[in-house]
């Protein structure tokens, strides 16, 4: 890794970065960007502007492939960045090895949000497949968070006594029969549940769940932590060809490295992301509920296998999701 915030020769001209990110990171990167621009200006004298683009992770990846000139991407899952590499050649295939922890500076998991008092008595994944329970989750075709939601439910079903791919598939089919609408991204699903009042339970990123309950409506909503869920690892990457074209490689790389500093890790914890830094994680351990967690590598063999089996055209999701049934 190059030295963090290394001085640049003649780094006085203003620069602009575009961070193309997934749906519920707006608040996180607003604070990260403010901290980084201050640190960078103090170190180099260069003023920078960091612009943000947010949406469903899969949709955002397609926008970059189609020409949105991101200097960096901070998406919901590695498969979306793999697609940018494979389809557009904008960064190397082994991009994930360039930063610590598989290029995931922080993690999250998948939990539930219910209405105050939990009138449907939602306690675990099994409750989401009961008749009469309306579940809000985004579309796995466009949302990275939705894919994590799906895989968390699949892993739970698979790990139950007697669980198999067949029982997990039936479990997911029953779950999606309870989903009345599929938004394109996680923030849209939160709006559907929180503002439009649809659904009994929202499957959500942990950070999005706490944002909704603690900062938007603690008198309206509460978080339910299931017995088991998945370690969600949102990765970050330099988009080499775009950064080189814009002359922003050095500052873009420094920005990504900044995400691993104690300052940025504390900002992540403030916004309910689980810090990867051991010291900051220990300081915020009480802020995050404890539950049994599994990884995508353990259960699905990694993102490439999961994407092909479940979310590519003709995959399991296409077979089980039948609106109107």
Task: Annotate each predicted stretch with a short phrase.
Residues 243-325:
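Extracellular/periplasmic juxtamembrane helices and adjacent flexible linkers that interface
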Residues 160-227:
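Ligand-binding pocket segment of bilobal, Venus flytrap-like solute-binding proteins
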Residues 104-109, 169-176, 182-184, 216-249, ...:
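Periplasmic-binding protein-like
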Residues 33-42, 65-69, 78, 85-89, ...:
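Sec-exported extracytoplasmic/periplasmic mature domains
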Residues 20-22, 114-116, 134-161, 175-179, ...:
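Short beta-strand->loop
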Residues 117-123, 142, 155-163, 242-250:
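Short helix-loop capping/hinge motifs at secondary-structure junctions, enriched
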Residues 15-143, 285, 292, 318-321:
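N-terminal segment of the mature folded domain
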Residues 1-9:
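Bacterial N-terminal signal peptides that target proteins for export
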